[in-house]
């Protein structure tokens, strides 16, 4: 190591920043968050530093630099665009053994400002020793995606209970095991879900159980009652793994067992914890690998045995995903659960095809419709879908394309209404076919698209040719003929 990483207490400590511009302001913001009492020394300062000075801890000296100003300071930062002045500040500080940082000049720095991941009181600093600041920043960005915001609250709770835990669990090994269980289980998930009161109650309950086991001289591991697990209903999005949420990825990587649908892509499934059991419970129209009631019971049984269960569903769990039915069953069984939203197929199909679902010139509302009812019968509520200024999205509608288009036209929607079929939205295999209600059936019969597919009906569909940016567009025969005639 060229530098030693340590954390420096600056609360109420005097710090001098020489400079009043953007560079000085960035350092001042960081030091202010650490509780330092900052003196800004500069003839002129930026508006941002003016705002910083509203904090009564901080002081402004509108003067040119003089070495008298560094006397008594804990650290000094030189952040001016005057190279000679920065060297002078460095020399004066070295003479008085005051740590100094000359911004963006590593040879003149006694210490370096790291890239910071702040989950106070959990703080991570990343440094490249001035060799590659951009790489340090990118490393920080990656860590930001991996560490939940709730880590800070979890650490504060642990700090508040540290003395009580120490008094009830006398051995270091016992305390380590206690905290590992708390940080890897129910307590942490409650905190991450924003249920801090319940998290504290769960931690106290865990402590009391452990204390009772120790008091009775029983083996903690043998006497530990089997804990009830939890179920995470996770939206896997439309297929592109980069469209997963951070929370979805975190829960997928700590699951003991994963029940996944047919619409979950292999790329997404591969991101689950490697040693988790992965069980296919897919459903395609009336062909169900496992009936819904059976899926509910599988989740209940697994969670009751103490497992962390991920129910991985394509798209969003609450948009034609039967997530509501599943959590009703979990609630009735007394199983704890969380629901993690995913990007629904309509959102992905819209964005990945350049077809906005709403547009001030074409559509002021949007309606999501399923092609089939609970009974398995086709949805026939076409009378409510005739507004020309409304976009209609049909999920699971490709197999009944002819019935849907005829129903819309019979109900009064213009035969010239644009329609788009989007197959495998967001994936490298995405395909798009456009047409009108009157001709889309013939086009699809001539060049059928694979499922899963979604239908977008409305004037916005005609924007695809203009705004498309991703994947392959199926050229219709009229366009091909026109193109040949132009040769």
Curated annotation (Swiss-Prot):
Catalytic activity field: uroporphyrinogen III + 2 S-adenosyl-L-methionine = precorrin-2 + 2 S-adenosyl-L-homocysteine + H(+); precorrin-2 + NAD(+) = sirohydrochlorin + NADH + 2 H(+); siroheme + 2 H(+) = sirohydrochlorin + Fe(2+)
SS bond partners: none
Keyword annotations from UniProtKB, A to Z: Cobalamin biosynthesis, Lyase, Methyltransferase, Multifunctional enzyme, NAD, Oxidoreductase, Phosphoprotein, Porphyrin biosynthesis, S-adenosyl-L-methionine, Transferase
Protein name: Siroheme synthase
GO MF annotations, alphabetized: NAD binding; precorrin-2 dehydrogenase activity; sirohydrochlorin ferrochelatase activity; uroporphyrin-III C-methyltransferase activity
Active site (catalytic residues): 261, 283
Binding-site residues for S-adenosyl-L-methionine, renumbered to this chain: 238, 314-316, 319, 344-345, 396, 425
Family, per entry: In the N-terminal section; belongs to the precorrin-2 dehydrogenase / sirohydrochlorin ferrochelatase family. In the C-terminal section; belongs to the precorrin methyltransferase family.
Pathway of action: Cofactor biosynthesis; adenosylcobalamin biosynthesis; precorrin-2 from uroporphyrinogen III: step 1/1; Cofactor biosynthesis; adenosylcobalamin biosynthesis; sirohydrochlorin from precorrin-2: step 1/1; Porphyrin-containing compound metabolism; siroheme biosynthesis; precorrin-2 from uroporphyrinogen III: step 1/1; Porphyrin-containing compound metabolism; siroheme biosynthesis; siroheme from sirohydrochlorin: step 1/1
Record-listed NAD(+) binding positions: 22-23, 43-44
Function in brief: Then it catalyzes the NAD-dependent ring dehydrogenation of precorrin-2 to yield sirohydrochlorin. Finally, it catalyzes the ferrochelation of sirohydrochlorin to yield siroheme.
EC number: 2.1.1.107, 1.3.1.76, 4.99.1.4
Residues annotated with Phosphoserine modification: 128
Alphabetical list of InterPro entries matching this protein: 4pyrrol_Mease, 4pyrrol_Methylase_sf, 4pyrrole_Mease_sub1, 4pyrrole_Mease_sub2, CobA/CysG_C, NAD(P)-bd_dom_sf, Siro_Cobalamin_biosynth, Sirohaem_synt_dimer_dom_sf
Region (Precorrin-2 dehydrogenase /sirohydrochlorin ferrochelatase) location: 1-203
Gene3D superfamilies xref list: Cobalt-precorrin-4 Transmethylase, Domain 1 (3.40.1010.10), Methyltransferase, Cobalt-precorrin-4 Transmethylase, Domain 2 (3.30.950.10), NAD(P)-binding Rossmann-like Domain (3.40.50.720), Sirohaem synthase, dimerisation domain (1.10.8.210), Siroheme synthase, domain 2 (3.30.160.110)
Domain of life: Bacteria
One of the protein's GO biological processes: methylation
Listed PROSITE patterns: SUMT_2
Species for this entry: Psychrobacter sp. (strain PRwf-1)
Region annotation (Uroporphyrinogen-III C-methyltransferase) ranges: 229-487
């Amino acid at each position: 190591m060229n530098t030693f990483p340590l954390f420096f207490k600056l609360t109420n400590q005097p710090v001098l920043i020489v400079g009043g511009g953007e560079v000085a302001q960035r350092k001042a913001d960081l030091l202010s968050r650490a509780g330092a009492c900052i003196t800004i020394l500069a003839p002129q300062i930026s508006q941002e530093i003016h705002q910083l000075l509203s904090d009564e801890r901080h002081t402004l000296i509108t003067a040119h630099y003089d070495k008298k100003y560094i006397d008594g300071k804990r650290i000094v930062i030189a952040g001016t665009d005057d190279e000679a002045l920065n060297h002078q500040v460095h020399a004066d500080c070295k003479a008085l053994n005051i740590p100094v940082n000359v911004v963006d000049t590593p040879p003149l720095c006694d210490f370096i400002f790291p890239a910071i991941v702040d989950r106070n009181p959990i703080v991570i600093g990343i440094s490249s020793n001035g060799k590659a600041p951009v790489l340090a920043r990118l490393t920080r960005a990656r860590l930001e995606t991996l560490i939940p915001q709730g880590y800070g609250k979890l650490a504060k709770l642990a700090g508040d209970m540290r003395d009580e835990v120490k008094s009830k669990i006398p051995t270091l090994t016992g305390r380590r095991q206690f905290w590992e269980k708390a940080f890897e289980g129910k307590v942490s998930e409650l905190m991450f879900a924003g249920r801090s009161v319940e998290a504290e109650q769960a931690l106290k309950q865990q402590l009391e159980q452990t204390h009772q086991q120790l008091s009775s001289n029983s083996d903690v591991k043998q006497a530990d009652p089997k804990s009830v697990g939890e179920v995470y209903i996770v939206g896997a999005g439309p297929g592109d793994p980069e469209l997963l949420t951070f929370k979805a990825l975190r829960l997928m990587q700590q699951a003991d067992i994963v029940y996944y649908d047919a619409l979950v892509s292999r790329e997404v499934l591969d991101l689950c914890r490697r040693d988790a059991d992965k069980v296919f419970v897919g459903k395609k129209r009336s062909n169900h690998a496992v009936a819904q009631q059976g899926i509910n019971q599988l989740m209940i049984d697994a969670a009751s045995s103490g497992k962390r269960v991920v129910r991985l569903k394509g798209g969003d769990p609450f948009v034609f995903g039967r997530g509501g039915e599943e959590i009703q069953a979990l609630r009735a069984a007394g199983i704890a659960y969380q629901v993690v939203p995913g990007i629904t197929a309509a959102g992905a199909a819209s964005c990945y095809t350049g077809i906005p679902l709403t547009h001030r010139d074409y559509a002021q509302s949007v309606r999501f419709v399923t092609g089939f009812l609970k009974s398995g019968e086709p949805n026939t509520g076409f009378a409510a879908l005739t507004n020309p200024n409304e976009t209609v999205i049909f999920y699971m509608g490709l197999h009944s394309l002819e019935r849907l288009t005829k129903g819309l036209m019979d109900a009064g929607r213009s035969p010239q209404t644009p329609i788009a079929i989007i197959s495998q939205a967001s994936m490298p295999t995405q395909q798009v076919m456009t047409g009108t209600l009157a001709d889309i059936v013939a086009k699809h019969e001539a060049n059928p698209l694979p499922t899963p597919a979604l239908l977008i009906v409305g004037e916005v569909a005609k924007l695809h040719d203009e705004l498309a940016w991703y994947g392959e567009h199926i050229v219709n025969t009229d366009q091909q003929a026109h193109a040949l005639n132009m040769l």
